[in-house]
C-alpha cells in the first residue's frame, strides 16, 4: 500500500481552467504528518507506519499517550493513525514528516472520511426505496418498506435486510478523485468533486487503488 496522509476537509470552492470551465473542488488541508512509530515484520508481525497530526494540550494527553509521544520525540497530536506499508515505499523513520509534497506526482486519489450523521431514518431516505401509492386506498403505508420476508419458510427475517435505522456517521471512501492542484506552501490539496464528511472533519488520502 502506498503512503497515506491525514488531512482536514476545509470546504469546497471552484477554480477555472484556461478555457473558462468551472471545476468544483474540495480543499483539503494536510498539515505535516509526524511519524510516531514504524512497525516491522520482525517486531510486530507486519509493516506499518503510525502518524499524528495537529496539536493537543498536554493536559488533554493521558500518561500512556504522553510516554508514546515522548519516546518518539514528537509533539502530541489530535490523534493517531496507522497505515499498512507494502515495503516498496521510501524509507520512513520515527520523527520524519510526511507532507503534501509526497503527493505532487499523484494524479488520482482515494479519500476516506466519516459521512455526515443523519440519525434514525426510514427505508425511503436510507436505502432509496420507492414510495407506495399516495391514494387508491392506501391510507397509512405511503412510506412503509413493504414486505420484509416470506412465510413460514424460512419463518424469519434475513440478516442484512434493508430496513429503517441509523443513517450516516459511517466510514466512507470516495475513489479515483482527480488531483487538481497541490499547494506545498499552504499545505493544501485540491481534488475535483466532493469528499465524505463535514467541514473540519478528518480525512485520509492515498493514491487511487484503481488507478495504479
UniProtKB/Swiss-Prot annotation:
Residues that bear N5-methylglutamine: 152
One Gene Ontology cellular component: cytosolic large ribosomal subunit
Matches recorded under PROSITE patterns: RIBOSOMAL_L3 (PS00474)
SUPFAM superfamilies according to UniProt: Translation proteins
Domain of life where this protein originates: Bacteria
Transmembrane segments: none
Post-translational modification note: Methylated by PrmB.
InterPro entries with a match to the protein in the record: Ribosomal_uL3, Ribosomal_uL3_bac/org-type, Ribosomal_uL3_CS, Transl_B-barrel_sf
Keyword rRNA-binding: yes
GO biological process: translation
Claim: Ribonucleoprotein is one of the keywords in the record: yes
Alphabetized UniProt keyword annotations: Methylation, Ribonucleoprotein, Ribosomal protein, RNA-binding, rRNA-binding
Molecular function GO terms recorded: rRNA binding; structural constituent of ribosome
Intrachain disulfide bonds: none
Subunit field text: Part of the 50S ribosomal subunit. Forms a cluster with proteins L14 and L19.
Summary of the function given for this chain in its UniProt record: One of the primary rRNA binding proteins, it binds directly near the 3'-end of the 23S rRNA, where it nucleates assembly of the 50S subunit.
Family that this chain belongs to: Belongs to the universal ribosomal protein uL3 family.
Name by which UniProt lists this protein: Large ribosomal subunit protein uL3
Primary gene name: rplC
